């Protein structure tokens, strides 16, 4: 991406009202705590107080050049920058910060065996039940976005309630992996779902190998913030993100912008058996961050922990839908997260639409307390419960 045209336009459309020209100090340049940085790719965040019409003018100039343009909840763009372009942008007063782009991956671990125990666990105070108890409102009137590898919408378990909505992976318009379909099944399939009447929308930000760029994931969140306002979701909009990577200011701000738009966001704590405070989007305070539990009421051995974790949910050996009309049992905080997204839809249908913060607190208040073993000090010992 070559931004010569943009850079001549920026002083006219992005300058703060009282200041045109270079800033006193360059805009921060962040490097995310990620395993794989994408060379010469950057995420540029505009200041929130820039007039929308000015931002829209910039978006028009970038449409054919940027990899992604953010124009809804998160304002900016992502793409390739030369050293000269990077320097010029950092000196512009309309730029909030710039961050190197990186790779994010799913938070699931594939396994071959398992049983559908999770629904029984979240509908009983004690472990061991194989019966799922729930109110028959079952998430009706809610829209749940699965920001993942996509959804196989034709799977019979979805009963026509699922839609593959949008792909941010070039040339891939199906779930060729299975992870997103599995998460969607835990949220709202007829057999394996927490909220069996919710509408399900797949937004593909991870490729068929389970990886995606930070910039593409921000695009997915920005898209959901806008799309959720156009759909008939009288009981609220929920998003589920079973993915994660090293700490990223831009990913966290993208998540915060999605929540600020009114969408409840459940995110995976991660599978590294470490404190989640240095991972994104798990460390974003406004998201509802989910750790994983096992069938024996222990913290799953892989689950991250720490003060950023809001709730635990079943995440080991979870049976759900898979691609090509099949089912599969897999483990990870990826599997715990859709339990919470489904529970958010379930409670929203049962009790009415509320704010994302109030809904996460409701999930915490309703949870079964202090039954999990292996939870480190400083981490909440809350296991999801639907109140049935």
Curated annotation (Swiss-Prot):
Please state what the protein is called: Cuticle-degrading protease
The main place the protein resides is secreted
Cysteines paired by S-S bonds: 143-233, 288-360
Q: Which gene encodes it?
A: PR1
Highest taxon, organism lineage:
Eukaryota
Q: Which keywords does the record carry?
A: Disulfide bond, Glycoprotein, Hydrolase, Protease, Secreted, Serine protease, Signal, Zymogen
Q: Which SUPFAM superfamilies match?
A: Protease propeptides/inhibitors, Subtilisin-like
**Mind telling me which residues form the propeptide?**
19-107
**InterPro entries from the entry?**
PCSK9_ProteinaseK-like, Peptidase_S8/S53_dom, Peptidase_S8/S53_dom_sf, Peptidase_S8_Asp-AS, Peptidase_S8_His-AS, Peptidase_S8_Ser-AS, Peptidase_S8_subtilisin-like, Peptidase_S8_subtilisin-rel
Q: What GO molecular functions are on record for this protein?
A: serine-type endopeptidase activity
**Which residues have a glycan attached per UniProt?**
296
The active-site annotation reads 148, 179, 334
Q: Which organism is it from?
A: Metarhizium anisopliae
């Amino acid at each position: 991406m070559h931004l010569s045209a943009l850079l001549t336009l920026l002083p006219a459309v992005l300058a703060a009202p009282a200041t045109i020209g270079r800033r006193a100090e360059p805009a921060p340049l962040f490097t995310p705590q990620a395993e794989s940085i994408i060379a010469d790719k950057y995420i540029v965040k505009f200041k929130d107080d820039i007039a929308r019409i000015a931002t829209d003018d910039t978006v028009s100039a970038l449409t054919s050049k940027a990899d992604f343009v953010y124009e809804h909840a998160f304002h900016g763009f992502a793409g390739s920058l030369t050293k000269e372009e990077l320097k010029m942008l950092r000196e512009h007063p309309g730029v909030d910060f710039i961050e190197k782009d990186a790779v994010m991956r799913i938070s699931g671990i594939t396994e071959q065996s398992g049983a559908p125990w999770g629904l029984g666990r979240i509908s009983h105070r004690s472990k061991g039940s194989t019966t799922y108890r729930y109110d028959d409102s079952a998430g009706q009137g809610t829209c749940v976005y699965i920001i993942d590898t996509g959804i196989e919408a034709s799977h019979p378990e979805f009963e026509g309630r699922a839609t593959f909505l949008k792909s941010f992976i070039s040339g891939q318009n199906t779930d060729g992996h299975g992870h997103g379909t599995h998460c969607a099944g835990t949220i709202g399939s007829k057999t394996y779902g927490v909220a069996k009447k919710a509408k399900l929308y797949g937004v593909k930000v991870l490729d068929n190998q389970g990886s995606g760029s930070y910039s593409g994931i921000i695009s997915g969140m920005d898209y959901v913030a806008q799309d959720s306002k156009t759909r008939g979701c009288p009981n609220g909009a929920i998003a589920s993100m079973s993915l994660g990577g090293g700490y990223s200011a831009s990913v966290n701000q993208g998540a915060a912008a999605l929540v600020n738009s009114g969408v409840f966001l459940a995110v995976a704590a991660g599978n590294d058996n470490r404190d989640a405070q240095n991972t994104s989007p798990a460390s974003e305070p406004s998201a509802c961050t989910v750790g994983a539990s096992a069938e024996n009421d222990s913290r799953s051995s892989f689950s991250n922990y720490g003060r950023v974790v809001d709730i635990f949910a079943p995440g080991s050996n979870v049976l759900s839908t898979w691609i090509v009309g099949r089912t599969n049992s897999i483990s990870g905080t990826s599997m715990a997260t859709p339990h919470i997204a489904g529970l958010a839809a379930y409670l929203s249908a049962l009790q009415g639409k509320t704010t994302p913060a109030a809904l996460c607190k409701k999930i915490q208040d309703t949870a079964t307390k202090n039954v999990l073993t292996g939870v480190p000090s400083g981490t909440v010992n809350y296991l999801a419960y639907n109140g049935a």
